[in-house]
Amino acid sequence: MSTAINSVEMSLSADEIRERVRAAGVVGAGGAGFPAHVKLQAQVEIFLVNAAECEPMLKVDQQLMWQQAARLVRGVQYAMTATGAREGVIALKEKYRRAIDALTPLLPDGIRLHILPDVYPAGDEVLTIWMATGRRVAPAALPASVGVVVNNVQTVLNIARAVEQRFPVTRRTLTVNGAVARPLTVTVPIGMSLREVLALAGGATVDDPGFINGGPMMGGLITSLDNPVTKTTGGLLVLPKSHPLIQRRMQDERTVLSVARTVCEQCRLCTDLCPRHLIGHELSPHLLVRAVNFHQAATPQLLLSALTCSECNVCESVACPVGISPMRINRMLKRELRAQNQRYEGPLNPADEMAKYRLVPVKRLIAKLGLSPWYQEAPLVEEEPSVEKVTLQLRQHIGASAVANVAVGERVTRGQCVADVPPGALGAPIHASIDGVVSAISEQAITVVRG
C-alpha cells in the first residue's frame, strides 16, 4: 500500500483531522484509553510513536508495523498535522527487524526511526521519550510539557483509518499467549467475550489456569472470562493458577502490607532499579514502604511522590529479593491521595549516570518471571472471527461514560454510533462492532445480538 496521502486528506485542517478522530471513537490503545482527539489538540515539536511493546509476551505492535507499515506512516503524518509537529519519530526495538525493513523505505522527510534496546520498561512513555529524544518529562507533568505527544502503534493505525475512511474503532488486535494450544495474535470485534478469544487459541493447556489481561508485568488479573474485549484490552495471558504471577495478583492488600512489614531488608534495591527514579524523579519506593509499614515520619512531598509511580512493576518482579510489592503499596497510597484530591509538584533531579545500564534486559526478565516454558511467538492471524453477540462497555476510555443513543430492539449496523458522551465531556463514542439487534442496555453496557 502506498504512503501517498490522497489529495482530500492532504487538504484537511488540524481541526478536521481531530474531528474525524473524535467521531471514530479513537482512544489510546496502549494505556488507559485517553481520547486521541484531545491528545492531538496539543501543539508540540515531536510526535512520537511508542512501538517498544516491552511486555515480553505481547506480539501485537511489532507485527502490525510490518503488516500495515504504509498506513502507520500516514497516521504519523496526520498526527503531525494535527499537533503541528515538525518531526515524527517511530521508536521500536532493534529485534523488530521485519518492521524496520518494512518501514525504512517508506519514511518521508521529517519522520525517522529510533532504535531502542531490548530492555524493560522501554515502552514506559516517559522512558521512551527520554531514550528517543533526550528530553525528560518532570514528575506529574505531561509529555506535551517537553514538546512531545505520544501514541502507540494501534492508536496511530486507528487515526489513519478514521481520517481516510471515517472508519470507527470496532476491532482490537491482541495476543493470546502462555499455556494455550495455539498462541496467536488476532483481530477481534470489540465486545467479544474473553472466553471466545481463548477458544481461538485452542483453549488452556493446564487444568487450573489463571488469566491476565495484558502483559505479565502490568496486566491485571481476570476474574471472569465472560468479560468483553474493549478498546484497551492488551492481550490474554494464560498461566497455571499456581504460577507466582497469578498468586501475587491474588494477594489481598492486608497480606501485601503484612509481608512488607515482616521481611523488608532495608536494601533499597527497589529504588535503585526504579525507572522513574533513575531518570531523576523523586519517587523512592523503599522510603514509601518504610513510611507506610513502619509509620516512619515522611514529608508530605515524599508521600505525594507515590502519585508519580507508573506501576511498571520492576520493584516487585525484579528488584526485591524477598517478595515485597512496593508497587502495590504505591497503588494503595495513590488511591488514598487521589480521594483527597492531592497533587504532586516536585523537582526533576539529574538522571542517574547508570540509568541506561539498570533497565532490565527482556531475556533476563522472562527468566526472572518464570515465563520461559510459556514464551511463544504468537504469529499474526489475519482472518477475523465471527461472533453472535457482543457486549459494548460504555466506558472504554478515560472520562465520562458514553450514553446509549439506541433502544432495545433497534437494529444496528457495524460502525454505527450506539453511544456517545455528553457534549463537552471528556470521552469517546462507542460503535457497534457487528450487524444485529440491541438486546439489552444497562448503565455499564449495550448488548448486540447478531440477527
Curated annotation (Swiss-Prot):
Belongs to the PduS cobalamin reductase family. One of its GO terms (biological process) is propanediol catabolic process. One of its GO terms (cellular component) is membrane. PANTHER family: ION-TRANSLOCATING OXIDOREDUCTASE COMPLEX SUBUNIT C. Keywords: 4Fe-4S, Bacterial microcompartment, Cobalamin biosynthesis, Electron transport, Flavoprotein, FMN, Iron, Iron-sulfur, Metal-binding, NAD, Repeat, Transport. Disulfide bonds: none annotated. InterPro entries: 4Fe4S_Fe-S-bd, Helical_ferredxn, Ion_transpt_RnfC/RsxC, Nuo51_FMN-bd, Nuo51_FMN-bd_sf, PduS, RnfC_N, Soluble_ligand-bd. Induction: BMC production is induced by growth on 1,2-PD vitamin B12 medium. Its cofactor is [4Fe-4S] cluster; FMN. The gene is pduS. [4Fe-4S] cluster 2 binds at C309, C312, C315, C320. A protein that aids in conversion of cob(III)alamin to cob(II)alamin and then to cob(I)alamin in the bacterial microcompartment (BMC) dedicated to 1,2-propanediol (1,2-PD) degradation. The latter step requires PduO. No free cob(I)alamin is released, suggesting a complex is formed with PduO that finishes conversion to adenosylcobalamin. PduS and PduO allow regeneration of the adenosylcobalamin cofactor within the BMC. Another study showed reduction of cob(II)alamin to cob(I)alamin in the absence of PduO. Both reactions require NADH. The 1,2-PD-specific bacterial microcompartment (BMC) concentrates low levels of 1,2-PD catabolic enzymes, concentrates volatile reaction intermediates thus enhancing pathway flux and keeps the level of toxic, mutagenic propionaldehyde low. Residues 255-284, 300-330 form the 4Fe-4S ferredoxin-type domain. Gene3D superfamilies: 3.10.20.600, Alpha-helical ferredoxin, NADH-ubiquinone oxidoreductase 51kDa subunit. It is found in: Bacterial microcompartment. [4Fe-4S] cluster 1 binds at C264, C267, C270, C274. This is Cobalamin reductase PduS. Bacterial microcompartments (BMC) 100-200 nm in cross section are formed during aerobic growth on minimal 1,2-PD-B12 or anaerobic growth on 1,2-PD-tetrathionate medium, but not during aerobic growth on glucose, anerobic growth on glucose or pyruvate-tetrathionate. BMCs can constitute up to 10% of total cell protein. Optimum pH for cob(III)alamin reductase activity is pH 9.5, no major effect of pH was seen on cob(II)alamin reductase activity between pH 7-10. Monomeric when purified anaerobically, dimeric under aerobic conditions. Forms a complex with PduO. Interacts with PduT, probably via the N-terminus of PduS. Pathway: Polyol metabolism; 1,2-propanediol degradation. One of its GO terms (molecular function) is metal ion binding. Disruption phenotype: Grows more slowly and to a lower cell density than wild-type. It comes from Salmonella typhimurium (strain LT2 / SGSC1412 / ATCC 700720).
